């Protein structure tokens, strides 16, 4: 049986009594364990941000046992939003979300300077921590030295804790393990969201950072059980936008050591999860949200709606696993 950290609550914050030893104004140790949906951004037909529908979604998510929400992650279509829109969305989410839930705001930009500025704007907008994706346009030069320098400068400057974000499917770049190990020692870097799905890599990072106050989150519901088994403490899962209660249930089963039950539920989540992530992407996630009573709707161009064939394939992934 894998060694596993015990937690007292399903997806909610555990009591935090220690202080992180650091010189930064962020100061306080932040426990990020639990489940987070990386929320979508609703748009009107002219492709303006629909803040009323956003508020409706947040109020529904607020009733589920999430640890918090990730705002302006990949599923929020942040590359297609202006800087002002990104910040305003975070403000609206913070206002609508229950106070006991975290707002983890995506603040990554291509330059270190812009990332520092956006991170502070997100903190000022109410974010409890920032999620910083790897800069990737010049990915051939983004070696460990460059990335350690980038994240260290961001964390040095930010007034809230920083969470590293590795999403190679979108960036073409895996945050190197040696860089993660080095960055885990920074007093204002509290964890990592890893969306690559390499469980050996996740296990190695958990093992190598155990002496630090550092937490690893799975970046997908598709490998959530496996990530928990090797020491991850939660997940940022696109599928939780649609099947939030079920993803939280899977987390609870893992935390409780009920691995046989967890395995059966994990099986039923794999195909729907793949469909709304690598299979058909954000347009599929938003369509599935519509099916399950949330506001998904259209994407901002150039993302296009699913074809009829893809729509039927998406429906099949949910129905064949008993969700529709």
From Swiss-Prot:
Residues that coordinate or bind substrate: 74-75, 195, 219
Annotated site location: Involved in proton transfer during cleavage: 165
Entry's Gene Ontology BP terms: glyoxylate catabolic process
One Pfam family from the record: DHDPS
Activity regulation comment: Inhibited by divalent cations.
EC id: 4.1.3.16
Protein origin, superkingdom: Eukaryota
Record field: catalytic activity: (4S)-4-hydroxy-2-oxoglutarate = glyoxylate + pyruvate; (4R)-4-hydroxy-2-oxoglutarate = glyoxylate + pyruvate
Transit peptide: 1-22
Function: Catalyzes the final step in the metabolic pathway of hydroxyproline.
PANTHER family noted in UniProt: 4-HYDROXY-2-OXOGLUTARATE ALDOLASE, MITOCHONDRIAL (PTHR12128:SF66), DIHYDRODIPICOLINATE SYNTHASE (PTHR12128)
Protein name: 4-hydroxy-2-oxoglutarate aldolase, mitochondrial
Source lineage: Eukaryota, Metazoa, Chordata, Craniata, Vertebrata
């Amino acid at each position: 049986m894998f060694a596993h950290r015990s937690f007292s609550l399903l997806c909610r914050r555990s009591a935090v009594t220690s202080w992180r030893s650091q010189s930064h104004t962020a100061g306080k140790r932040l426990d990020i364990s639990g489940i987070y949906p990386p929320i979508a951004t609703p748009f009107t037909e002219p492709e303006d941000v629909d803040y009323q529908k956003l508020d409706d979604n947040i109020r529904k998510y607020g009733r589920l046992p999430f640890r918090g929400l990730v705002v302006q992650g990949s599923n929020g279509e942040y590359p297609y939003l202006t800087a002002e829109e990104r910040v305003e969305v975070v403000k609206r989410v913070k206002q609508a979300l229950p106070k006991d839930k975290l707002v983890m705001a995506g603040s990554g930009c291509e330059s270190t300077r812009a990332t520092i500025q956006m991170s502070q704007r997100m903190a000022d907008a109410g974010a409890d921590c920032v999620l910083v994706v790897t800069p990737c346009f010049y990915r051939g030069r983004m070696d460990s030295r460059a990335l350690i320098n980038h994240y260290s400068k961001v964390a040095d400057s930010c007034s809230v804790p920083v969470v590293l974000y590795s999403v190679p499917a979108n960036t073409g770049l895996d945050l190197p393990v040696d860089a993660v190990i080095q960055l885990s020692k920074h007093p204002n870097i509290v964890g990592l969201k890893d969306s690559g799905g390499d469980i050996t890599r996740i296990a190695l990072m958990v093992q190598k950072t155990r002496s630090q106050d550092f937490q690893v989150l799975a970046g997908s519901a598709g490998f959530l059980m496996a990530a928990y088994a090797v020491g991850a403490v939660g997940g940022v899962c696109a599928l939780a936008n649609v099947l939030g209660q079920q993803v939280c249930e899977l987390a609870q089963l893992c935390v409780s050591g009920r691995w046989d039950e967890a395995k059966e539920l994990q099986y039923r989540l794999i195909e729907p999860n793949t469909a709304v992530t690598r299979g058909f992407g954000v347009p599929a996630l938003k369509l599935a949200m519509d099916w399950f009573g949330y506001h998904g709707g259209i994407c901002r161009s150039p993302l296009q709606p699913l074809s009829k064939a893809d729509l039927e394939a998406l429906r099949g992934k949910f129905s064949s696993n008993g969700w529709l």
